[in-house]
Design a protein with these regions (language model features):
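Non-heme Fe(II) oxygenase metal-center motifs and adjacent flexible, charged/small-residue loops
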Residues: 1-484
Length: 484
């Protein structure tokens, strides 16, 4: 469940190797003012599309910009306490996820839960009318961008010659395009560079300060586009620059820019495009270069939610709880099957519910109450099901430690579930430590991480202790060479 540091370490190794190859030199990059820019865009970055502000309805601009301003003024955008390379840190960007009810989006070991936008069949009670209108505006923008993204992909794929295209192929292309352009979440970002004491310099091209480092967007539906609405919030003093040299045309440090490069390639020139207020960009690999003024972006995407919706996790709970039986008259619980594969599956789901959902949700404090009470009931229900799974773990332990269990069956069952219980204990300590960290304590009261579920050893309502170390020691004795 815990995000592996391996991928971060691999990326850092690749980065250092490339920088070593460069030997202090910088890779060239082109801007719209440079000769060869259009040819480079066409040949190396053809999947980037830019839609200028004047081609988007003025009324939509007004609604969206009002919504973004309201969310900022109401304190509804948050700097996430994420984990990179095993260390907690705050994102330089404040953000919030708005999207389809019951959906989530995970990045940097952090699962964001959607503030639900209005949707057919969903009853959403917003905290007030302003927040409701803001969420509706984001939904309207999302609908517009879905149409624009579909149009863009259709134009690209329609470039196939008629000789290469059959009616069946055309219909299949249309279906695939439709499936890839139904954005289900919008990640809203805000950053004021003047409020940041430090921003990293772009390391490969010398492009300037980065608001968002080079990255691939995580957890997207394969080959789906990302649509980004950019809005420069208000004027500030121009950014400071060394010396008195006038910024090179197209490379102005006061202007927000999006930069693109070929991943792990030091031979292909990069691109840097200015982001004028209201522009739309679609791409997968990029960094964002900070300008002087505060900026919003609304990034619309098809989050890969096969394991990230309430429907999914409640379905998983049902699979686990199928192995729990309660006597209709006495309510006495028992396990339906003692097959090791069944026991393991239930414990895997138990861990998933606790660490991918409950602890992720409560680690973000009570921030979601600023918008709506929509998540309260589902999370209460999820915790009830998790408690049933705690009961199931207790039943497993009663069985394997009972006198009537044959030694061979006992050993096989313990070997199956022990790694999952060890992981559970480790992750409980990990999340508790994160909740008590120095950075966590700096957050406002309604954003401060909550270590939940947490209970003392004297809590009679819980069948097992929070700390499983004593139980693990007993189980380790069973599977040791000298165990019974």
């Amino acid at each position: 469940m815990k995000r592996s540091d391996n991928s971060d370490n691999d990326k850092e190794i690749k980065k250092q190797k490339l920088l070593q190859e460069l030997g202090g030199l910088q890779i060239p990059y082109l801007t719209p003012a440079d000769e060869g820019f259009q040819q480079l865009w066409k040949t190396k970055y053809s999947k980037l599309a830019l839609k200028e502000a004047h081609s988007t309805p003025l009324e939509l601009h007004s609604q969206v910009q009002t919504a973004l301003s309201i969310l900022l003024e109401r304190g509804c955008l948050f700097r996430d306490l994420v984990q990179m390379k095993g260390k907690d840190m705050f994102t330089p960007v404040s953000r919030v996820l708005i999207g389809a009810p019951g959906h989530t989006y995970k990045y940097l070991n952090t699962r964001l839960f959607t503030i639900p936008w209005p949707a057919s069949g969903a009853v959403v009670r917003y905290c007030d009318d302003e927040v409701a209108r803001a969420c509706q505006a984001v939904k309207d923008l999302n609908d517009y961008l879905c149409v624009e993204a579909k149009r863009c992909l259709t134009r690209r794929e329609g470039a196939l010659s008629a000789a290469e295209t059959t009616a069946n192929v055309t219909r299949e292309m249309e279906r695939e395009t439709n499936n890839r352009t139904v954005f289900n979440v919008a990640l809203l970002n805000y950053m004021d560079p003047a409020a940041m004491s430090y921003l990293k310099e772009e390391p490969y091209f010398g492009m300037g300060r980065m608001a968002v480092s080079w990255h691939h967007d995580e957890n997207l539906v394969d080959r789906s586009p990302v649509a980004v609405y950019s809005y420069s919030y208000k004027d500030t003093e121009s950014c400071s620059a060394e010396g008195d040299e006038k910024p090179v045309s197209g490379r102005d440090c006061t202007v927000w820019r999006i930069a693109l490069k070929v991943a792990w390639d030091i031979h292909t020139a990069g691109l840097a495009l200015p982001l004028h207020s209201d522009d739309l960009n679609m791409t997968h690999q990029h960094c964002v270069l900070a300008g002087a003024r505060p900026r919003f972006s609304s990034t619309h995407r098809m989050a890969e939610c096969s394991a990230g919706t309430l429907e999914y996790i409640f379905g998983r709970c049902q699979v686990a709880l199928n192995n729990l039986h309660k006597d209709p008259s006495s309510e006495r619980p028992s396990l339906v099957s003692l097959e090791v594969s069944v026991l393991k599956q239930a414990e895997e789901i138990h861990n998933e519910v606790e660490f991918e959902w409950l602890r992720q949700y409560w680690f973000q404090g009570r921030r979601y109450a600023k918008f709506s009470d929509w998540w309260c009931k589902p999370m209460e229900r999820l915790e009830e099901l998790w408690r049933e799974m705690e009961l199931m773990t207790w039943l497993v332990l009663c069985t394997v430690e009972g006198e009537g269990c044959p030694a061979a069956d006992r050993r096989e069952a313990v070997q199956g579930v022990l790694p999952l219980l060890e992981e559970r204990n480790q992750l409980r300590q990990h999340w508790r430590a994160r909740c008590q960290s120095r950075l966590a304590k700096t957050l406002p009261a309604d954003e401060e991480p909550i270590c939940h579920p947490y209970w003392s050893d004297h809590n009679a309502s819980m069948p097992l202790p929070f700390d499983l170390q004593e139980i693990l020691s007993r189980l380790e004795d069973i599977v040791s060479p000298t165990g019974l």
